Amino acid sequence: MLALFRASGAENRNLRRAIKSILGFRPGNIFLYRLAFRHRSASKVTHGVRRNNERLEYLGDAVLSAVIAHYLFKKYPTQDEGFLTEMRSKIVSRASLNKVGLHMGLHKMIQLEHGHGNNGGFKSVDGDALEALIGAIFLDKGFRFTQKIILKRIVGMHMDVDELERKDWNYKSKLIDWCQ
């Protein structure tokens, strides 16, 4: 039993170091961050409840969307709602978040059920973990801290917003506009 606690303590220290290295801060409630990296395929059932990162992912998605909406509102003061919505969609898209999560090295920390390989064939595992991580930061540190981390350490270091602005995204809308 004591070995279990030591292993858990070592795992917690390693996770704390990894988060400090990637995001520049020491987490408080390490168990939130451990949960953020537990994929549904590796769910643990406690008192009849499946414990995985999906609830944190839900929360992180909402926090990320709010932070990005505010960021874009300030960055583009003369742009209309359609432009802002399209830009937010580009930034928080599954493809974009997967790319950022992979670039950040989150795949190294994700706990998957054995036999699923690096990403277990799950296409959105890195982006889902990124959203869950944002949810964990929010619960651990609050909105303002999370906002700073998102803008400085995620958007600032791993996204080129100006490049995303130039990128054609909504091909269906472009086709409809062209046909009219």
Task: State where each predicted segment sits.
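Double-stranded RNA-binding/processing signature
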Residues: 1-180
